[in-house]
A protein has these predicted regions:
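Glycine-rich phosphate/pyrophosphate-handling loop used in enzymes and phosphotransfer proteins
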Residues: 1-218
């Protein structure tokens, strides 16, 4: 007689929303689509996706949200309060679509000053976009502690002097997806584009979590 391992009844899966801390019902559509859902449908409805498409220096860009009070509050909680658990809630609903849309692309995240990353224990841009489960090339680094909100528009245009690219050959011939959390004047993204162009990538596209209103896109 062949011995068989006795069947054990697995305990029901319980996911808790990382925003309201309520149980995510197993019967919800989101729970059925995502085994490890981290945000409930009720909380996600407070986010208002726009999928706005525009160009930056001739390259295709898209922001998922406007930089409204909801995004501002949750980003502050992530960055300012070091709540790394919130990183997954922004893109979870869209990750299957975005992975398909940017199939074959390698993510290059916008940098933050390394001392800030050390203080909070993570880079917030990397945490947000890591939920896409796409290869990430961390080749651009910020070498000066500078707060862009304190700069004039003209000063922001010189932001490229505060960044360097290391091991740029990693992006040669690759399809590159530049990502950032907030697009205001676009100075950081534009500087990244100019740095990346020098290494002759196959393609460049830009994906932004959010974008402020009524500002020039070019």
């Amino acid at each position: 007689m062949t011995w068989k391992k006795p069947e054990t009844q697995s305990s029901p899966r319980t996911n808790i929303c990382k925003i309201c801390f309520e149980k995510i019902e197993d019967s919800s559509i989101h729970s059925l689509l995502f085994d490890n859902a981290t945000i409930c449908h009720k909380c996600f409805k407070k986010f208002r996706p726009v999928f706005h498409k525009f160009d930056v220096l001739g390259y295709k860009a898209m922001n998922l949200f406007e930089y409204d009070d909801q995004i501002k509050e949750k980003l502050y909680q992530l960055k300012g309060c070091f709540d790394v658990e919130l990183g997954s809630v922004f893109l979870e609903y869209f990750s299957p679509y975005l992975r398909l849309k940017y199939l074959g692309y390698k993510i290059v995240p916008a940098p933050s000053y390394f001392e800030h990353d050390q203080k909070r224990g993570f880079n917030h841009v990397e945490v947000v976009f890591s939920s896409l489960k796409m290869k990430m090339i961390k080749c651009i680094h910020k070498i000066s502690d500078i707060k862009q909100s304190d700069l004039t528009a003209k000063e922001r245009e010189k932001i490229y002097k505060k960044m360097i690219i290391k091991n740029g050959e990693q992006i040669t011939g690759k399809k590159i997806l530049i990502v950032d959390d907030v697009f205001t004047t676009g100075s950081t993204v534009k500087a990244m584009i100019k740095m990346i162009e020098k290494y002759h990538p196959k393609k460049i596209k830009i994906l932004l979590l959010s974008k402020t209103k009524n500002l020039s896109e070019r």
